[in-house]
Structures are given as structure tokens and as C-alpha cells.
């Protein structure tokens, strides 16, 4: 091992700034994985050959010929090395669901950032199955199933996508898509948290720091009610107590927030109804049929009293089954003329909070019909037996009208072609206001002339009604409180010391505050190597100025893992969150990542990690990171597998010598399973307490830690979560009884059902000590000492005695 000639080939021959920038670029389409479950092995073999020959796709088949956990281990350990290889990867799973369930395979696929397709219930001649398989071949190396999610919402309209393309902003669109995926995952993670902590359904409310419209939609997809908290709200400029009656819709107002909304333009009521469902769990829906836009929502705990002459018992049953809501369908017209709670079964909501959605119209004398509705709703607001939270009424008045209790009069997103508005009634609405027909006509002329994006963006006026104005850093952090603070609390208007104090208090209070922020050192590294980012970025220490292609400019503070760990927070990746929440996740997936998104990291409180996440299974594993970066760099440099491990042995040898350990006390092996053998007992002084090595034991330093240190230069790397898991699993642990054993395929399990330890404390801390030398070797001295330093500092905090 001491032979000085043992240095060829090496990494310095190949790795330069261009190599590093190329790795950043590859990350945009990393994990091109599709996990495809079907019941027909011969069909899998046929299409495996087709897609491999046509597009060079790496194909794996799990067919039951090998015990399932062993098969999963071999397959996904192999895939872990291929995730940055630029080639599509397809795994066909043909074993029965009783062997490996849909839920387990979905968790595994998403843990590796893949697309998941379940068709084991389809016959061999099923048109759906054949179509999906044909698409697999024809679309390769892409696939038309999103990664890490059941649905996908891309460009709102084709003209908007065309505008982006002609203005060289298509990369930014991928950034927005992934940002929306991120927000969706954060919501799904909160839903998982609510389930695990058994939070009552009526208390499942999440506070969202910083406005972004899709949170309303994605919260209702997960059975959660959202509220926003903002430091201030721009004056809408309209009439009424909150300025929401015909608010100003000039460009300045509309472009003040994000334009992108992930809604299907064919589902015009989605914006309105998800907002209204956020205001109460008791809903009177008048003119409900067909309400297909509600079928993808999760409404467990909601009660919906639906009126429509077209309603059938089948419709009622289907709506209840799809959404989980208690649905009472009434197949008749609502009686607006009878000023009685009993007449329309509203007595069932006595002493309850109720919101009302009206989507009714008639062909004859629509003006008179609207007047009847208005009078009824004004009357209903004044009832004391029912706490009416909010009423939305379809509004197409053609005459001047006096209105009571009117809180807002807003254009209907997606409703320009039918010149439709919505009136909102509330106890705090204007007591008596005149709405002029000519004024609303002119207003709708202006609205119709706007772009579709700007029309959709007017939903922000609705969301003002579920927004609290205040300082998020002063909110109560009682146990069970859920807060999403992504792309928000890191804003430069919030001093870092206050943010860190707030997060520390949240951890101590056992609240669930999910925090997202730019990663200071990764961003600095990207700029240092000359990476061209999707957003123009300037840095002054940890103050970052962003300017994106849509014209927005803002400033954030960057944060590091070590300072957040000091505050009681642990980094977790979006991939880990979506895999961990896969049993409840009902959000969107994505197709392409962006370098901009990889500059951010997300953190959760340490109390939750210690309670729920110390037992590592594939959902919480960094398996999608630990092999692919080192394998890519090693292959680029043609460094043999054996040589790579011998290099690691040399680095350990140098470190031990630097600590005055006599070389006769150990024997360097430098293999994949053994770094060195301890010949005689010795100890190494360390800030976490002495590292103790007993005679006649083998030491295998943590390759995961070293690989994560390389990955951390390019993408979010959950080093501290992994270190917490290693500390907990430094001894054998029994398999948890409530989890499928297949999720632990990457672990070694003893005959008694215990998970064998991953590494000793010494093996982890020794790896941390050579981490910078290792990164310097792998990246030819073009590594970031700051990234390595903060990781090492945080790991030492985890293991400090």
C-alpha cells in the first residue's frame, strides 16, 4: 500500500471546472427511472428488449426467481450507481402483490426519484397495459408518467408555454414545475405528520408563511385546510371594508405575486371551490352536479349537503367514496323563496360553522332568480342558529343592485368567456352598497382583455380572505401546530438570529415547522465553478439577491446545515419526504429538475426525527445519492473499483499517522468491505470523545458519509439525518412491527428479525475526519472546504458525548 507508483489512474487527470459543471447539468435529469408493475413476465421480457435496443435503456426484471428482499437489494443497489448515467432505467416487477405490495413498490420508486406505474390488475391483452408499454418504448428516454407523484400539471395554456419558449424561459418553467412539486410534497408531508400524531381531523390546519396560490389546491388534495400568514397585504383598491369589491386589476397588482397556477383550465370551478372548502368543513353546495373537479380531493371529515335536480344516489355514493366526505345528495332545486332553515335541511348545521357555494342559474328571468338568491343569502347571514362563515354566489347582474353583507365581488378565474363573477357574503361585509351594472360591465371588459395567466392570478383576491396579517416569527407554537415556511422565512426581511430562535422554539415546543432556504455553501460553490444558473444570483456573504426571468427580484439569507442543527433542525430532502409520505401523498409529480431548485435545502425539527425517523428504511435512506456521484466521477476518470477503495485506505492511513498512531497497530486493507484490521488496541483523541479501536476487529469506514459529502456539492444532501440514524443504529435494532419488511431490503437482517448495525461510532467519525481529503481527491482540489466544514461540524455535534 505504500508503493508511491500506486497513483495511476487518478482523478486529477480528468476532473476540472468543466467536469464539475457537467455534473451539475446532469443533475437536471437525474434518476431517469420508471418502475413498471405488471403480471406478465413474457410481456415484460419482450418490452425490456424493445426499449433496451431502441434507446439504450438499462432494464431490470424482478420476477420472483430470487427471494424478494434479495432481488430488491441487487436491483436497486445496481440502479443507485446508474442514476446519473444519462440513460433511462426501467424496472419491470412481475411478482404478485402478495409478495411485494403496490405501496412498497411506490415507496421504493419514489425514494429513487422515479416514475411508478401499477398495472398488475390488467390482463395480458388489456389496451391500457399495451398502450403504457408501447409508450415506454416510443417515448424513451422520457416517459409520460410524472416522477414522484400521481398527477402532473404543466403549462396552464399552450400560449403561455409558447411565450416562455420564444423568450428562452423554458428552463425557468422546469424550475417552476419542480417548485410546485416541492410545495405539493411539503403539504403531503404535513398530512403524514397529522396522521402519525393523530391530530383530530377538524384541527388539521396548516399555516403557510408567504403567499403562493397552489397551496390551497394541494392542501385540499390532502384533507388539510390552509391559512396564509403575511407581514402585509397590498391594498386591493376596491370598495368595501377590505377593498375586495371590484378590486383593482391593473398590472402592478397582478404581477406582485407568482403567476404560475397548477390548475387545469377545463376545471373552472377548482380555484373557487377549493378556497370555499378551506373556510369550513360543513358545506352547502347549491347546483352541485356534476362536481367532477372535487373527485381528486381528500375531504375526510367534511359534510357536504348538495342540492341539484340532476343528483342521483349513484352520484352521491361515488362522490362520498372518492372524496371521503359525508355527502347528502338532494335531487331537487334549492328553495330560495322560503326563508326557513328547515325548508332546505339546513337545521342539520345548527350550532355549526357553514360555508355556502352557489353555482345555480336558470334560463328564464335569470335577473329575478339572482335577486331571490341574494335576498336569501342576506337573510341567512343574519341567522344566529347557524354560524355562516362565507357564502359565494354566482353573479351576472344586469341591473344596478343594492347589497347587504357583501364582502367581495370578484371575477371568476377561468370565467372571462362567460363574463362570470362571484359575490361573497360575510357578517363583516358592507352593510349597504350599490353595485352599478355599468361599472361591472366595464370591469369585466377589462378582465376579459387580460391574459389568461393574469385572469387566473386574480384568485389571490379570494385568498386574502384566508390570510392573517402578522409577523410569522411571533406566532404561537403550541404542540401540534403545523407550519410550512418554504421560500419565505429565509427572506432578508427576517433577520437570521430571529429565524433561528423561532425554529429553536418550534423544536422545543414540538411544533412541526418545515423550513426551506437557500444553502449558502452549495450556492457559493456553484457560482465559484462558473455554473450558469436559471436565475441571476449575487451573493454578499450569506445575503443572496435573486433575479428570475419573469422579472421578479428578491433577497434571501442562505443557511447551512450546522447552524440549523444548532437550532434543533435536521435537513431532509424532498425525495425523502415524498417517499416517506407515499401512503398519503396525493399531489403532483414532475419531469425535470433545475439547478436553481438544487440550491435549496429543507429542514424539519429534531424532535420529530428522533421520534419517527431514526430507524432507517429505504424511504428515509440516502440511497439515491450515495452511489451515483462517486460512480460517475470514478467512471469519468477511469479509476478502477479496487483502486478507489485503496485510495480510501491510504487516506485513513495518513490520518492515523498524523495522530501518531503506530502503523504496527493496524493493517490497511483498502477494500469495499474492510478499510483496515486492528492488530492491537489503540485510541485516537477526538473532540467527540476518544475513538476506540479494539484488537482483532475489522473497521470499514462509512462510504455513505463520504459519498454524501460529494453529493452535497451539487444537490441537497441529508447528511445529518443519516448521521442521526447511524448513531441510533450503531447497535442492532428489532424490525418495527408496523412496517413491511421489504422496505428494509437495503439493511442486513439477522435470523431473529433484528436490523444489523450499519456502522460503529468510530467508523462514522473516522470517515468524517478524512472527508476533506477525500473530497479533494475526488474533485481534484476543486471541492468546497465550507461544505465539508459545516458537514463535519454538524456530524461532530450529533456524536458528541
UniProtKB/Swiss-Prot annotation:
GO biological process: 7-methylguanosine mRNA capping
EC number, UniProt record: 2.7.7.50
Annotated GO MF terms: GTP binding; mRNA guanylyltransferase activity; RNA binding
Recorded family membership: Belongs to the phytoreovirus protein P5 family.
Keyword terms, alphabetized: GTP-binding, Host cytoplasm, mRNA capping, mRNA processing, Nucleotide-binding, Nucleotidyltransferase, RNA-binding, Transferase, Virion
Keyword GTP-binding: yes
Keyword GTP-binding tagged: yes
Function: Enzyme involved in mRNA capping (Potential). Binds to GTP and might have guanylyltransferase activity. Together with the RNA-directed RNA polymerase P1 and protein P7, forms an transcriptional complex positioned near the channels situated at each of the five-fold vertices of the core.
Pathway stated in the Swiss-Prot or TrEMBL entry: mRNA processing; mRNA capping
GO cellular component: host cell cytoplasm; virion component
Principal location: virion
Organism in which the protein naturally occurs: Rice dwarf virus (isolate Akita)
Enzyme class: transferase
Compartments (UniProt record): Virion; Host cytoplasm
InterPro entries named among the record's database cross-references: P5_Phytoreov (IPR044310)
Superkingdom of the source species: Viruses
Catalytic activity reported: a 5'-end diphospho-ribonucleoside in mRNA + GTP + H(+) = a 5'-end (5'-triphosphoguanosine)-ribonucleoside in mRNA + diphosphate
UniProt name for this protein: Putative mRNA-capping enzyme P5
